[in-house]
Amino acid sequence: MTTETRSLYSQLPAIDRLLRDSSFLSLRDTYGHTRVVELLRQMLDEAREVIRDSQTLPAWCENWAQEVDARLTKEAQSALRPVINLTGTVLHTNLGRALQAEAAVEAVTKAMRSPVTLEYDLDDAGRGHRDRALAQLLCRITGAEDACIVNNNAAAVLLMLAATASGKEVVVSRGELVEIGGAFRIPDVMRQAGCTLHEVGTTNRTHANDYRQAVNENTALLMKVHTSNYSIQGFTKAIDEAELVALGKELDVPVVTDLGSGSLVDLSQYGLPKEPMPQELIAAGVSLVSFSGDKLLGGPQAGIIVGKKEMIARLQSHPLKRALRADKMTLAALEATLRLYLHSEALSEKLPTLRLLTRSAEVIQIQAQRLQAPLAAHYGAEFAVQVMPCLSQIGSGSLPVDRLPSAALTFTPHDGRGSHLESLAARWRELPVPVIGRIYDGRLWLDLRCLEDEQRFLEMLLK
């Protein structure tokens, strides 16, 4: 060991001496004596390794308390960190999909802080039904006879098939054998539910007679799957639910539908593309309809099944129902969200998903112009900051081919180097509240459709 190396080792402080320093008192109060000591030992080992390999001290050895504070602060950050979503995708699956309405947030907070009547009947002091209150609300909105709630729509489809068609055949058009994120495929779900898939028709064309010819003594269901995350266009043919229900009645086979996104209002009244609604399918005579709670409905993650009472009863009594049931927080948020639909005139103001989807391009353009000046002043030395028109998307497999006119702030490096864009995006992801945009066509785009808190946005980007 050289004299220089010995000198470097000698500069490493003892843990006891560090802990006596006043700067460590607040750290010990905040994070605990044990964790601070544990980290200091780890940092001493790191410093010795750097000395051994590089014959130098780490830069942070100049201020041990500051480095300990920085590391423990980062360690204490929640795994579920709030972010500013400027990707242009409103229902971003990786960012948690639908933002919850204030009424839903308040309902969840109350449910978390207190015992609730989850399965308790106040009238006779006996055991109540977990889904009962929400079932009544869903029946009022959709016109169904009964309803069942589970933890997501994949679970809803699994339960629907397992409870009504296990050991039997389910007839589905080839053009509707969808796959959604995470390799969730309708054929795989059928296999897990114990059903046999009977494909009919072709990818682009399926006729009523295809279903008719497929039905046999082992057929349990005729199934429609709404292709919410892709679109087949051109030379196509499909039969709608009403026609399939008529065929099902003739052949004595129930019809079920996996609707996927599940909008409870006609989106076209807000200038958005129309999506099929559960109440329309119930009115057409479909026996069971499943859809998501956290997509176009704008609530928490949940799988909702509405339909005929005798069919719902089979789902409620199936062993899988207990494994897939929703908890009290989900039910509280979902109930509060559904109640907003009873007053549709205020829905676009109170439901964040609808509010963001219906923001006009003109309003977003004005917002972008307002924010351009301070950002250009801050980043102008390295980037050209411009206001550009763009197209937002709904996301989460909803209305896949439809885009919403919007406006973005774009950052283009003066030197044209893509690495500068990657570096800027990485810096923004490290902010206390990360700002998430997207890199495209030599620019970093911040689509402002989902930006409601301008002050917090500027606080982050002007740091």
Swiss-Prot record:
GO cellular component terms attached to this protein's record: cytoplasm
GO molecular function: L-seryl-tRNA(Sec) selenium transferase activity
Cofactor: pyridoxal 5'-phosphate
EC number(s) given by UniProt: 2.9.1.1
Main location group: cytoplasm
Broad class of enzyme this protein falls into: transferase
Catalytic reaction(s) noted: L-seryl-tRNA(Sec) + selenophosphate + H(+) = L-selenocysteinyl-tRNA(Sec) + phosphate
Pfam families: Se-cys_synth_N (PF12390), SelA (PF03841)
Keywords: Cytoplasm, Protein biosynthesis, Pyridoxal phosphate, Selenium, Transferase
GO biological process, one term: conversion of seryl-tRNAsec to selenocys-tRNAsec
Pathway membership: Aminoacyl-tRNA biosynthesis; selenocysteinyl-tRNA(Sec) biosynthesis; selenocysteinyl-tRNA(Sec) from L-seryl-tRNA(Sec) (bacterial route): step 1/1
Cell location: Cytoplasm
N6-(pyridoxal phosphate)lysine sites (modified residues): 295
Assembly behavior: Homodecamer; pentamer of dimers. Binds only one seryl-tRNA(Sec) per dimer.
Protein family membership: Belongs to the SelA family.
PANTHER family documented for this protein: L-SERYL-TRNA(SEC) SELENIUM TRANSFERASE
Protein function: Converts seryl-tRNA(Sec) to selenocysteinyl-tRNA(Sec) required for selenoprotein biosynthesis.
Protein name: L-seryl-tRNA(Sec) selenium transferase
Source species of the chain: Escherichia coli O45:K1 (strain S88 / ExPEC)
Lineage: Bacteria, Pseudomonadati, Pseudomonadota, Gammaproteobacteria, Enterobacterales
